[in-house]
Swiss-Prot record:
Statement: the UniProt record of this protein carries the keyword Transmembrane: no
SUPFAM superfamilies for the chain: L28p-like (SSF143800)
Subunit and interaction comment: Part of the 50S ribosomal subunit.
InterPro entries for the chain: Ribosomal_bL28/bL31-like_sf, Ribosomal_bL31, Ribosomal_bL31_B, Ribosomal_bL31_sf
Alphabetized UniProt keyword annotations: Ribonucleoprotein, Ribosomal protein
Source organism of this protein record: Listeria monocytogenes serovar 1/2a (strain ATCC BAA-679 / EGD-e)
Encoding gene (name): rpmE2
Keyword Ribonucleoprotein assigned: yes
Protein name: Large ribosomal subunit protein bL31B
Domain of life: Bacteria
Protein family: Belongs to the bacterial ribosomal protein bL31 family. Type B subfamily.
Amino acid sequence: MKTGIHPEYRPVVFVDTSTDFKFLSGSTKSSSETIKWEDGNEYPLLRVEISSDSHPFYTGKQKHATADGRVDRFNKKYGLK
């Protein structure tokens, strides 16, 4: 890789603003806010609106589409099935 053209990859703390869940991960994103983490070090803080802690897919609260779709409406309208 060429030197000087890639962004700096460093540890960053992400905080889910809807659940206040925090996790440490690597990122190239920069931030002016910092937070003291559990290990005693200070890391940049990035706020996210949704994470694996609040996303319906991961929490099990995902809504499934009902069977009342376009095909079912067509079948009801024309008396099929």
